[in-house]
């Protein structure tokens, strides 16, 4: 199971890629495999404020609905609108096509507190 080294991870199975002062957030390959076929993705609006630990959307699969938890706080600067019409991207390409939101980072220390790829791999038993 892919756990890219350049990303950071939350215990709730979100990944974070930092580009300057923006964090790109999605769900991990492990999370999508546990959920099964994704049929719907609900995301926040651009300019919404999200807070670390709070829900910022949900992913619906044929099995269940799973909340998305913000790994960091900040302002949503972009939403992946392709997921509205193509939720299957979450299964097919969790780290590329299926990024969910881009967030302006409000607290750098929250990035440092996330798991490394090695720690996340240990957590999921890889």
UniProtKB/Swiss-Prot annotation:
Residues 22-104 form the Lipoyl-binding domain. GO terms for cellular component: cytosol; glycine cleavage complex. Coiled coil: none annotated. It holds the Pfam family GCV_H. Keywords: Lipoyl. Its cofactor is (R)-lipoate. Binds 1 lipoyl cofactor covalently. InterPro entries: 2-oxoA_DH_lipoyl-BS, Biotin_lipoyl, GCV_H, GCV_H/Fam206, GCV_H_sub, Single_hybrid_motif. The modification N6-lipoyllysine is found at residue 63. GO terms for biological process: glycine decarboxylation via glycine cleavage system. It comes from the Bacteria. The glycine cleavage system is composed of four proteins: P, T, L and H. NCBIfam families: gcvH (TIGR00527), PRK01202.1 (NF002270). Belongs to the GcvH family. PANTHER family: GLYCINE CLEAVAGE SYSTEM H PROTEIN, GLYCINE CLEAVAGE SYSTEM H PROTEIN-RELATED. The glycine cleavage system catalyzes the degradation of glycine. The H protein shuttles the methylamine group of glycine from the P protein to the T protein. Is also involved in protein lipoylation via its role as an octanoyl/lipoyl carrier protein intermediate. This is Glycine cleavage system H protein. It comes from Staphylococcus aureus (strain NCTC 8325 / PS 47). The gene is gcvH.
């Amino acid at each position: 199971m892919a756990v890219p080294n350049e990303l950071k991870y939350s215990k709730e199975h979100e990944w974070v890629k930092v580009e300057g002062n923006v964090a790109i957030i999605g769900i991990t390959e492990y999370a999508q495999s546990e959920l099964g076929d994704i049929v719907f993705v609900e995301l926040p609006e651009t300019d919404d404020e999200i807070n670390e630990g709070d829900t910022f959307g949900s992913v619906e699969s044929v099995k269940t609905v799973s909340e998305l938890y913000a790994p960091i706080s900040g302002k949503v600067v972009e939403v992946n609108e392709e997921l509205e019409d193509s939720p299957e991207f979450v299964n097919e390409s969790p780290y590329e096509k299926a990024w969910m939101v881009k967030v302006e980072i409000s607290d750098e220390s929250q990035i440092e507190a996330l798991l490394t790829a090695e720690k996340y791999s240990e957590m999921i038993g890889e």
